[in-house]
Amino acid sequence: MYSILRRAAPLRRRAVSALAAAVLRREEAAAEVVVSRRATIPAAWFHSSPAWLGFRETGAAGAAARPQYAADEGLFYEEDKRGAKAGGVAAGGAEEGLEVAKLGISPKIVSQLASRGITKLFPIQRAVLEPAMQGKDMVGRAKTGTGKTLAFGIPILDAIIRHNEKNSPGKFPLAIVLAPTRELAKQVEREFSDSSNVETICVYGGTPISQQIRQLNYGVDVVIGTPGRVIDLLKRGALNLSEVRFVVLDEADQMLSVGFDEDVETILDRVPPKRQTLMFSATMPTWIQRLTQKYLKNPVTIDLVGEDDQKLAEGISLYSIASEGHAKPAVLGELIKEHAKGGKCIVFTQTKRDADRLSYTMGRSFQCQALHGDITQAQRERTLKGFREGHFNILIATDVAARGLDIPNVDLVIHFELPNSSELFVHRSGRTGRAGKKGKAIVMHSYQQSRAIRMVENDVGCKFTELPKINVEGSDLMSGGFDSFGGGGFGREGGGSYGRRGSFGSSSSRGGGFGDSGFGRSGGGFGRSGGGGFGRSSGGGFGDSGFGRSGGGGFGDSGFGRSGGGGYGDSGFGSSGGGSGRSGFGRSGGFGDSGSGRFGGGFGNSGSGSFGNFGGNNSGQSGGFGSS
């Protein structure tokens, strides 16, 4: 039954459709039956040449004859049914790219790629294709953003399609692709499913594992996922790797950096020894070299970076600009207006907190969203979908988005802080200028970091154009200067709640709501000098020693208000001393203003003005929420 349903693809793509799910429930018992594949898949099943290619060349002779490929070589196949001739690349062939229609791959793939406007391959794709189609193990070092996903995808998809045309599709996967992040895994899965009708599944944490188990029971051709979730599925017995013939490690160095090294080795130990392994990495640390020696057999090395070559993709223009902290959001706004011109822009920050704060500040003038590790998976997917579809054009992200995300047509990347390493600069900047398109990357730095800019230039082999200083005095974003967020909470001395001076309108510009070192400190009360509520030091709810201390304070101390302060307690809703809490939501400003709403609380007692009219020096006195 599952075999019949699988041939009904693309009814189900990326997840089990409602119809398929209903059929699965009715046929649950039948779905447990595993249709074994026919004889072991031939080693050269993916090559239509009459010459037997073997899964790998072995022996000294084969190793000696093995070529090492580079981007500037004309990579066509030997004369065979694919129609290409050795040495048939003209001098400009490498520049023009290799035509997909001449590869001799399945017409289904050619048609799908053509529908996406892909008719030629870029250098990494051209360099990878020949050894991959010949079944050779491979280690590829490539520039970021040059389309390597399609490079290893085409040979795998072609192999699976040809196999399924000759054999009944089985239940267990023929290929597995490991990626360090869920975003990269989803990108790879999307590339595979958009290029053919093979059955794929993307597995990663943060989503119900039961749904992934059901889909695996249904039968898939390719598993793409993060090592952690793959290990979980293996432990549950839901994933069987006994028929895997292709293994891909994408962004392998990043799997090491996020702690997946042991999981990767466990997975490699579980796949059959007779397989083709393709590994791609921007860098080659010791762990990558050890993996190569242990798990790859006579691998072809493809280095499209080189020690002296520029590591950024071509077409990215680089700029730098000096800016001090308090003015940075305003400068950022001007950069976006000038260089993005309404197009897509990604702004990278160092921390999750900075991404949230900057998103809030920039949201006053731009359509933007934050993306970082604390955002739920569902929200992250909605954010990425909205950005791709143009519902908003500015994404403020941490480095979770710096590697592997395929977001088309990003016009501008801005490094809000100088990256910690040249390598990180490359990965961040690689979000623009992808697949041969033009893009810009701008680094914002302090005047003291000019030397660090020179170091990046030396390491990467690039040159920044220094932009002139931008005058942002009077900008709407200056009042929400990044420094005003302060440290230890959304606010600090000198800056108000969410960065406004004096919070919700205080005259003192002191003691920021949502405070410093905890929800409000030093002058608390949603931004009031010396007043209570949500603060500390002379009355601060949500502050020190319970919900308020020292001088009585809204949501108070010792029973929602102390030392003469009404607040939801003492003296009711404010008789003789402050509606909703004297020295809290009431006295000396409560929600803001120095001198407003003092004495005479209540929601409308003569001369009251409790709540302080949300700000304004001396505003709300004898008034506020309606008194005569």
From Swiss-Prot:
Motif (Q motif): 98-126
GO biological processes: Group II intron splicing
Organism of derivation: Oryza sativa subsp. japonica
Record CDD domains: DEADc, SF2_C_DEAD
Free-text comment on this protein's domains from its UniProt entry: The Q motif is unique to and characteristic of the DEAD box family of RNA helicases and controls ATP binding and hydrolysis.
Region (Disordered): 496-548, 571-628
PANTHER family, sorted: ATP-DEPENDENT RNA HELICASE RHLE-RELATED, HELICASE ATP-BINDING DOMAIN-CONTAINING PROTEIN
Catalytic activity of the protein: ATP + H2O = ADP + phosphate + H(+)
GO molecular function: ATP binding; ATP hydrolysis activity; RNA binding; RNA helicase activity
Limits of the Helicase ATP-binding domain: 129-302
EC supergroup of this enzyme: hydrolase
Record-linked InterPro entries: DEAD/DEAH_box_helicase_dom, DEAD_box_RNA_helicase, Helicase_ATP-bd, Helicase_C-like, P-loop_NTPase
UniProt keyword terms in alphabetical order: ATP-binding, Helicase, Hydrolase, Nucleotide-binding, RNA-binding
Compositionally biased intervals (Low complexity): 500-509
Family membership: Belongs to the DEAD box helicase family. DDX21/DDX50 subfamily.
Name the record gives this protein: DEAD-box ATP-dependent RNA helicase 9
Binding site for ATP: A142, K143, T144, G145, T146, G147, K148, T149
DEAD box (motif): residue ranges: 250-253
Composition bias, Gly residues: 510-548
